[in-house]
Amino acid sequence: MLNESDQKIVQYRITRKYEEMVNSHVIMDNTTNKSSWEKIKKAQLFCDFLEQKNIFYEYCFKHPEVLGCDESKSYYQRFCSYVENYTICKNLVVHERKGKHRKFLIITDQSKQVDLKKLKEVLASSKLEFISEEELATLLNTYPGNVSIFNLLYDRDQQVELIIDEELLTSELLVFHPLYNGMSMFIKP
């Protein structure tokens, strides 16, 4: 448990039109360093950007930086006991090894395994492989473990094709990072 001197609470919640304002918390604790503060600021600016574009989310909270779905699962269970019926999204960026060199952002339930051979057939593409760290940084301004649907904002040339698992559309809430893997956002599909 955090003591008061270690806590700094930033309360914010964007609500849908005509709904009552309800608070949600982003807790800044003693694990938050200067670099993290800058990333948190960027994520909060991104949340403001979403509001300006009338894209609303339900909750957003800070947690230690995570580099994958398995690592993040325990934080969601701990911090989100009050939230029901959410799906943590797995975000994978792959590209064709040969041919047209198409690039894809694959979004599915974090509990699912993605079979690249089967996906290749579904997408009628050549052999698929994960994109390099360098290309990920150049294309989507991110790094492995920090990929989110929101990184498509950096794909100005629209090189990345978005592939979303249809089952996600039946979830009440989807969980994505708001451009920083130390925060998570719950948003309706």
Residue ranges and their predicted role:
Residues 2-189:
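Extended, low-hydrophobicity, polar/charged segments
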